[in-house]
């Protein structure tokens, strides 16, 4: 029921990652490279265009992501290189503006400020270049893979990552959701949630330039997504060492797209070139599920109850657990979604939650006005610009 880091055994991961990817399981794939399923998108067009064969193709993709290597490459997903170049030019304009504006630069799993990052690139592209947005996100390979993993109604976000020449590799990790939680938090989620978390998100990347191995395309450990304790294991030294010696790394061409299970052990590689700015548009596609049925103004709720909650906190008769219970019922307990331009993950993987803010207010005995002002500022940071 409950998992702990003490339960992690490297031998269990080794047994899973020693699995051979069987080409017969993926009849529509063009090849298997270093255990990774590779599809030539030109060869998929006929199957993708017919409803019955499209479903079979999607089942194969989902199998590769869940039970197979956990990763699939779609070569030539964007056939029009000029479209990629035009979108890249918009991204470069945004990056140049960010440099002129200064300010802190947060990042996930990498050294802040060492590379270039555009948060909420999807919205920024739509506002700046709606014609390019329409052509770019009309891509059927992105929709094919996203709906294969998540079904209909998914939501797409994107963050552009540019690894500059000399940019160093990320630390191995798993991704959103549980991958963003420290072990002491991840251990509080029951085992079945560890199993369910990968089904809420699909990770992808569009190559916006040719990415030879020396430019540091992403490192992957095929089949590692099947390790049930992986969200607690990836920070452990022996697991990191194993990743460093057993990962695979595939070169990509401009317009290729990679999709992978967010539970796959992976990390961006070191850019050893002197001139290649390795640009990828990182797609994070989310399930329509995982949301509450009703919209609740939690800022209003917390502001309304704070004085009574503060009295309870000050009372010797109140168990601290009961205070935590009230905070859980009233405040937003998750840091996402947020605006990562204003609410950056500096010093960690996730910004402060509203619930953590309320707990701090009680611990420091803030008055009502101070709490209300802090809540308003917190909500403002999370809003899109």
Mark where each language-model region is.
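Short beta-strand His + acidic residue motifs that chelate non-heme Fe in jelly-roll/DSBH
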Residues: 266-274
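A short hydrophobic beta-strand segment most commonly corresponding to one strand
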Residues: 222, 275-291
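Non-heme Fe(II)-dependent double-stranded beta-helix
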Residues: 17-183
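Fe(II)/2-oxoglutarate
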Residues: 1-67, 326, 333-337, 344-385
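Double-stranded beta-helix
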Residues: 185-188, 197-267, 289-292
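A structural signal for short, well-ordered beta-strand segments
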Residues: 160, 204-206, 281-285
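Active-site-adjacent segment of 2-oxoglutarate/Fe(II) JmjC oxygenases
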Residues: 284-337
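Short secondary-structure boundary/capping segments
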Residues: 90-91, 172-177, 220-223, 235, ...
